Amino acid sequence: THVKELVEQNHQKYESYGVTAGIYSAGLKLKETQHQVTFASIQSAARNLDDFDKPYSLIIIDECHRVNLANPDLSRSSSNEQSQKRAKNITKGSTENKLNADSQELSQQNENKQSNSNQYQQIIKKLMQVNPEVKLLGLTATPYRLGMGWIYKKHYRGFIRSEEKRPFEHCIYELPLRYLIKREYLTEPNVVDATIEHYDFSSLRSNASGEYSPTDMNHLLNKNPRVTQGIIEQVIELGEKRQGIMIFAATVEHAKEVFSYLPANLSALITGAIDNTERDKLIKAFKRKEIKYLVNVSVLTTGFDAPHVDMIAILRPTQSVSLYQQIVGRGLRLSENKKDCLVMDYTGND
């Protein structure tokens, strides 16, 4: 997977069933390959391909909707191209400085996505060289990408999702959110569109990924400073009896403004610029409920596991259904004394 938090969470859950596995992640200071199963950070694995010289039978990619495995630039020898055809691809169901900070963060996020795709291709190529019969399994709660649609071609119930090239061939199993919520495997979301204070991003143009320019968003947000203050006042009021509140801001500048209106002793701000040590410290404090409000910009949308979160405030626009579901999903984990998750959308996301 793409972040060390997910590597650690997945490893802990796997070993809770009484089995053992290794971890290969520089961020977790472990590089173990002697076990039958290895939970790896894609960045660490791709930088140390020679460490993966044993024949693995299965590659599992968590959050596989993030990865563009259909990249035509991936070069293989003719034997590897034949092996790739045999391998089954399957999936489970302001100031200039402030503007530069946001632009740099967006640029870094885009570079990371492209880099991750290339790194996944590198490790897949390496493992296929060792074992041409290795299989590929993708796991995701959101099997689609904006601009692409479904990331697989065929559903196991017989219908065709796409005739075009896709990262995965078949969906072999699907477990809808509605089913999990109805049977109380997940918490019921209570989604509310804010009617008093809200942002209007309708004049902005999104890119192919459904995201908006930080410069454009900052320009719009700076025209309405009272709106943000009013929104946070409502978040504090509605969240009085809530255990953990996550706030998703539009830009770094916006996140800092949001943070300034929250109780300082109960709040934390996480952006892509924060160092790993401080980030880990703040996340642990939030999970221990020492911090009630956690403001972030595009860094805690995937795989972040804090079951006590029972309120989500969305202050960023997106046209990506996948991203929206990932954001809401941060509040759907079951937890003690948690009856539902209040989701406040202040941006009019459809």
Name each region found by the language model.
Residues 28-58, 69:
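Conserved helix/coil segment N-terminal to the catalytic DExD/H
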Residues 320-336:
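Conserved SF2 helicase motif VI
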Residues 1-13:
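Conserved Walker A/P-loop ATP-binding site and its immediately adjacent core
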Residues 75-76, 80-83, 110-188:
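Post-DEXD/H (motif II) to motif III coupling segment of the RecA-like Helicase ATP-binding lobe
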